[in-house]
């Protein structure tokens, strides 16, 4: 089976959960910025035991694709109004494409990034253990680049024919609970605008900032700037003041690290983050809140709340438990 790219959209790449274990060699992890939504799309596409199957990540608008054979797909993440052969198709539900069918995902009406998963996953040659596209190193995915019109993506053969898997899933499928439609069950929202409040563990260089700066950071709104990308979300708001500057000897960076730049503005690392950095890190967004950060558009705002390591671990365990409960309900496992 092959999925043909009829129209790629602004930025569509092949992504899985990332190229783990190679930062010491200088390679970014890459992978989906919103791993929750990729996992959800995989679940809905029949890949329940493999939430990290390679699919497509698209930004602001999705691609138009054509199937050459029966193909089971699902969409999650940022919400659009997809169409199959010009007729409305669902988000957050299995979609069976027949030979020659065209799926047009269209512009996102909410969220920043969306995900297309396919039953069996994409049959892309792994590089360093991952099929994810690294746009900086030009490896993984389709020749290490964003997709173009005319690209043909092979789909792995699964353990069951797509049409059989679709029929089986339809017997058990019910509309998703509202919490599943979100990128996460958020800790909270700020005001009537429902701006995400992200939990952040202090450190490792939080001691470089004044107590007043830490308080202001965790009680202020920060707006996403237009120069944000898959590498990092750049924010603008109340400057975070350091005691004696923010430069440090470069040390390791992880997804969710919050650096404070020379002008006092926060930078939140995403999937394509560099392996080291020389700005002080005030904290790290907990892993189950990173998907929410990845879905905030330029011009929208977020807030932060400090939590302990133990609180962060407990929060992510609760999210994992909810996910497992839904998977059991959905697949009867």
Write out the residue ranges for each language-model feature.
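Conserved "landmark" site that anchors the functional core of diverse proteins
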Residues: 1-333
């Amino acid at each position: 089976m092959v999925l043909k790219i009829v129209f790629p959209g602004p930025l569509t790449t092949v992504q899985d959960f990332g190229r783990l274990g190679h930062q010491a060699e200088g390679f970014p992890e890459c992978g989906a910025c919103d791993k929750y939504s990729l996992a959800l799309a995989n679940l809905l596409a029949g890949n329940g035991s493999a939430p990290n199957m390679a699919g497509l990540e698209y930004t602001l608008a999705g691609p138009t694709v054509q199937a050459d054979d029966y193909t089971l797909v699902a969409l999650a993440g940022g919400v659009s109004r997809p169409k199959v052969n010009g007729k409305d198709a669902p988000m957050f539900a299995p979609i069976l494409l027949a030979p020659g069918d065209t799926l047009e995902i269209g512009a996102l009406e909410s969220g920043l990034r969306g995900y297309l998963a396919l039953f069996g996953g994409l049959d892309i040659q792994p590089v360093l253990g991952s099929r994810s596209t690294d746009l900086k190193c030009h490896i993984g995915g389709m020749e290490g680049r964003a997709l173009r019109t005319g690209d043909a993506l092979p789909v792995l053969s699964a353990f069951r024919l797509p049409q059989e898997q679709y029929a089986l899933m339809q017997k058990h499928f019910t509309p998703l609970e509202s919490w599943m439609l979100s990128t996460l069950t958020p800790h909270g929202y700020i005001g009537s605008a429902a701006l995400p409040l992200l939990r952040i563990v202090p450190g490792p260089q939080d001691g470089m900032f004044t107590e007043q700066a830490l308080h202001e950071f965790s009680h202020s709104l920060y707006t996403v700037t237009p120069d944000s990308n898959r590498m990092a979300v750049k924010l603008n708001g109340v400057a975070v003041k350091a005691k004696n500057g923010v430069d440090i000897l470069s040390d390791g960076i992880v997804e969710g690290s919050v650096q404070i730049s020379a002008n006092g503005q926060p930078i939140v690392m995403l999937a394509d983050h560099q392996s080291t950095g020389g700005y002080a890190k005030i904290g790290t967004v907990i892993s189950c809140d990173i998907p929410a950060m990845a879905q905030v558009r330029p011009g929208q705002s977020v807030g932060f709340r400090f939590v302990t390591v133990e609180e962060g671990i407990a929060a992510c365990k609760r999210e994992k438990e909810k996910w497992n409960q839904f998977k059991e309900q959905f697949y009867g496992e």
